[in-house]
Amino acid sequence: MESKLVVALDLMKESDLLGIAGKIGSQVFAIKLNWPAILVSGSRIIRDVSRYSRVICDFKVADIPNTNSLITEKVLEMGAWGIISHSFTGHDSLGAVIESAGDMRVFSVVSMSHPGSAEFINPNTDRLLEMSIRAGAAGFIAPGNNPAEISRIKKMAPGKIIMTPGVGAQGGKAGDAIHAGADLVIVGRSVYASHDPVEQVENLNREINSSV
């Protein structure tokens, strides 16, 4: 069974990031890279990590359409499998990401897992989701520490990929997220900050597989 685990490697030391990527790459669905890795190592880190696993660039793209297109085109050029974009900037900005993505999957943020998301993003989840579906997003980001919301979003977006952060350090459980309807579960600190990332990945894969 293919893994449903996406590991976020938000590390500021390139050797540590690549070391863990090399150890776990074959056991996960994808490795997620955020701005810390890019700021330290440059965009080439996308290609370097792609040697070990699919790469999802969690850039939460949120600018005017032209800038969004430039960012997305570069990420595609570097070989990423997917990119995460905000949707609150509107249909034209999200549409620019999707139009520039080629065969790269675009995941739209429609709900988040941290406390501050209750102020603006989460109250508008339904509108963001409906707009993102019309724009052609491949999938959505839903909070892994809120199984009820995962289930609700899954029902509203049948056939779309639901990817969930908020598992591990933010309190969510991988098995609960999968049982609620998540297709992919994102885990970061619980893996890369553990004394044995490989063992932690194996444990998470077992937990996820038992919930499928």
What does each model-identified segment do?
Residues 2-5, 63-147, 159:
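Conserved anion-binding
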Residues 137, 144-191:
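A C-terminal functional module that forms or caps the active site or interfaces directly
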Residues 17-18, 22-24, 33-77, 116, ...:
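N-terminal active-site wall of soluble small-molecule enzyme domains
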